[in-house]
């Protein structure tokens, strides 16, 4: 992501020239004073852009991320195409206002991050911005989690934010942002008749300039049985397909999301992957991915409780729920948060000084 950011901000002359000549570019590096009703996007992204008219109309969003990595869906080529599509929308404005109306979200009950009821450390954050005192983008989702928890409304459906086109069975060319590069059999897109080579232009009436624009439409649909109407060009003709998604269609791999760490239960430890030579020396079954406890955060009650129960720095997790551990550190964290509640115990198998130990990790958040 740093490489992509540098390419956009400094190195790519086409992007710089286009931005300077046709846009008023503003670079925002934190969320402290941002109008959260106006600027609604996936706050877990490492890099995001929004394109607006001076009257607040949203033309487009750009920036997509997944467990595949920060740049799997982004490219200079598709960013430039999005920018040129935005210029076309701007030239047609306000005649095309209807196709843009849904691009701005419903007003929030608060204006900025520091007004969010769930935002922690608000007094400290209200001070001057510094490296250790800024509101990160993912902190917005963190605060949303806290609000939902306080209101007793926390549920998994709220976690499936900004679903990828892949959830419809569509793979979009990252070099274009709208062109379908693959259609997966058995998914809604294939059932509706979309084909490789189709170029998406609208979703539920909204103009599309990027993958992120499609994600915005999908984000605002429920995780129950739902429909979305996609318009596309196929060769020299326009087509329209209605996709029908089954309940649970938004569920996806959220292990990469920074805001995942704020969801309870919190482990308050660093369980890190081990180097291959060390893994081999343990002589574990094929496919086991051990995690080493490198750090226990005793500044938090969750960490103190784990340590009191017997967890030690240097312990190696080799099993969970009486099965060999076969997941990454991120997926281990995700599994716990999606399958356990505060007050539960997480059954693990540890290696300590060469001996296997059963350890029931207390997932408590109070001393």
Where are these regions (language model features)?
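PDZ/PDZ-like domain segments forming the peptide/carboxylate-binding groove
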Residues: 161-202, 206-209, 267-319, 323-326
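A short, hydrophobic beta-strand/beta-hairpin element that forms part of a small beta-sheet core
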Residues: 46-63
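Thiol-based oxidoreductase modules, predominantly thioredoxin-like and allied folds used
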Residues: 15-34
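Typically the conserved alpha-helix immediately C-terminal to a functionally engaged Cys/Sec
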Residues: 1-18, 146, 151
């Amino acid at each position: 992501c740093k490489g992509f950011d540098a390419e956009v901000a400094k190195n790519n002359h086409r992007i710089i020239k286009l931005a300077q000549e046709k846009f008023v570019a503003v670079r925002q590096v934190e969320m402290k004073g941002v109008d959260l009703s106006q600027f609604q996007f996936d706050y877990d992204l490492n890099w995001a852009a929004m394109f607006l008219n001076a009257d607040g109309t949203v033309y487009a969003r750009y920036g997509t991320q997944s467990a595949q990595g920060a740049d799997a869906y982004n490219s200079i080529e598709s960013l430039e195409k999005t920018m040129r599509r935005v210029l076309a929308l701007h030239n047609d404005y306000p005649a095309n206002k209807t196709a843009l109306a849904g691009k701005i979200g419903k007003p929030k009950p608060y204006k900025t991050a520091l007004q969010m009821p769930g935002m922690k450390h608000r007094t400290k954050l209200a001070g001057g911005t510094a490296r250790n005192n800024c509101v990160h983008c993912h902190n917005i989702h963190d605060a949303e989690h806290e609000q939902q928890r306080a209101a007793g409304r926390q549920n998994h459906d709220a976690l499936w934010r900004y679903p990828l086109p892949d959830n419809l069975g569509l793979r979009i060319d990252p070099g274009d942002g709208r062109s379908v590069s693959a259609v997966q059999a058995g998914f809604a897109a294939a059932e509706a008749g979309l084909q490789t080579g189709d170029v998406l232009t609208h979703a539920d009436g909204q103009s599309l300039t990027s993958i992120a624009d499609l994600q915005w439409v999908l984000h605002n649909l429920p995780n129950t049985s739902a429909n979305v109407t996609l318009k596309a060009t196929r060769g020299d003709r326009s087509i329209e397909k209605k996709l029908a998604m089954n309940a649970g269609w938004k569920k996806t791999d959220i292990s990469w999301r920074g805001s995942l760490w704020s969801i309870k239960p919190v482990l308050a430890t660093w369980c890190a992957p081990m180097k291959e030579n060390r893994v081999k020396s343990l002589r574990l079954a094929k496919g086991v991915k051990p995690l080493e406890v490198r750090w226990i955060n005793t500044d938090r009650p969750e960490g103190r409780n784990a340590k009191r129960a017997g967890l030690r720095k240097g312990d190696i997790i080799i099993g969970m729920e009486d099965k060999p551990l076969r997941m990454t550190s991120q997926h281990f964290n995700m599994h716990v948060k999606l399958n356990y509640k505060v007050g539960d115990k997480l059954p693990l198998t540890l290696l300590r000084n060469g001996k296997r130990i059963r350890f029931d990790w207390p997932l408590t958040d109070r001393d």
